[in-house]
């Protein structure tokens, strides 16, 4: 099987979280980063015939050097929330055939257009120092009346160094690429 997504289902007192830790090994201070992914819904369950609320996997990010560490970033409260990257299930048009259990009426095809949404956001104005870690997290807690098994797929990440690094790179490239004149 070649198609997989990381997923979470917060329900009752269960709290689920997925994330990653990235280290800045560029040798430069990075001033922005962009995250892109596909939000997929694979199953739904609720207490009625239609969802009573939306289900949300809240996105947050943070850096090492504070209270967040590689050991605790999935539960650390100091991470910075960014709603633009939250994975939110549709709040309407999800008629449920069963409240719970292994029922085919609960299943959704997270690869179909109705249950797959592309998300992208850029965080700028940061100072991600060389050697420091960046923590990215999606957390899913219980949503009253409705829960969805939500996945993160096709994850992409890029980061940009501070402007002075770009200037140095461009000047160096220009010096190499410019033809030399012979007199």
Roles of regions detected by a PLM:
Residues 20, 43-46:
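Catalytic micro-motifs at enzyme active sites that drive phosphoryl/nucleotidyl and oxygen chemistry
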Residues 47-58:
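Short coil-to-beta strand junction motifs in C2/discoidin
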Residues 31-44:
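A short beta-strand element within beta-rich, extracytoplasmic domains
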Residues 181-183:
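Short, charged juxtamembrane terminal tails flanking transmembrane helices
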Residues 13, 27, 39-40, 50-51, ...:
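Terminal, low-complexity interaction segments
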Residues 18-20, 33, 55-57, 134, ...:
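Residue-level detector of short, conserved catalytic/binding motifs and their immediate flanks
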Residues 1-28:
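Surface-exposed, low-complexity/disordered Ser/Thr/Gly/Pro/Asn-rich loops and linkers
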Residues 162-179:
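A short, hydrophobic C-terminal helix/tail in secreted or cell-surface proteins
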